[in-house]
Amino acid sequence: MSLATMKRCFCGFRHMGVLWMLAAMPVAAGTARIYITNHAGTTIQVVDPATNKVVQEIKDIEVPESVHFSPDGSRVYITNGAENVLTVLDRKTGKQIKKVPLSGHANDLAVTNDGRRVLVCIAETPGALDIIDATSLEKIKSIPTKSRLHDIVVTPDGKYAVATSPAGKFASVFDLQSEQPSWEVNFDQGALVPAIESGPDGSARRLFLQLSELNGFAVVDFAKRQEVTRIKFPDDEPSVVPSGTPSHGIGIAPDGRTLWVVSRSYDSVFVYSLPEVRLLGRVHLPELRLPGHDPIGGSPNWITFTPDNKTVYVANGADRSVSAIDAKTLKAVARIPTGEEPGRMTTLVLP
């Protein structure tokens, strides 16, 4: 998915139902932390990119799907797939503020740039985009969609949200002022993880997203409101048996100069220059080798970055690990053990 690095405050905490397993330590301004959800477990782990070690762990969140923060860092928002709620935590005290009931199974979430609303994808038929007021912590609106939603990103200028639907095979663009669907792009395959490239004025220029049967990614021109091309990964090496869709996980580096796209079929992440979309290289990721079986992929998926653009993190779902990659040398520098099926990751930075 696209970079979720934002300037936030960070603190370890303990509260009813959620526990920081390792003691919280003072964190200096400008320090980054990588938050990792474990989709088949009950934990969210926190990694210090300076050491690539897990420094804290949140427990007792059943099927954590996604984690984001309020702009001022005062709240933590977590979608809870098992309970169909948005769990809201106080960042300073660690106490649970509220569990906000949702319309159905909670998937990805996003926070509007002004912090006033939390947007949650409902991955349950018939599908919806739930809007939660961040002041009252009440669901104030549920926008019906043609099918269940998977992932969501807010455009850099804060004017739109883009949500994708694997089952419905579309990407829907929502106007955040009117809180209504604005336009959509339909595909011949399921629409998966999106990333948004901004233009010089901060507005959305291109949408990069993965499709359910494409070992590569599609490119949508935001102004034209249409798909303009598809890019396939080079097929110069034997593939492994992918666990899931061929390609799942995409992100744009903080400086906007590179696009990183995961291939499950090749158990790799490919790097492209922006705005040219020219292939720069690839990084091989861990494979699973079971006795008596052909190698299978480690199911690489989600991506995040350190704010200095130096390190890229890729979650390896089947391998129960996250790979830390040096963005300059394109070499893996660490394999970080995680919980069951690591998934969405978010980078947080102290102001």
Residue ranges and their predicted role:
Residues 1, 5, 58-61:
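Short linear, low-complexity motifs centered on an aromatic residue
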Residues 25-351:
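Predominantly soluble domains enriched in secretory-pathway, periplasmic, or organellar proteins
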Residues 1-2, 8, 253, 306:
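Intrinsically disordered, low-complexity Ser/Thr- and Pro-rich stretches
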Residues 2-20:
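Bacterial N-terminal signal peptides that target proteins for export
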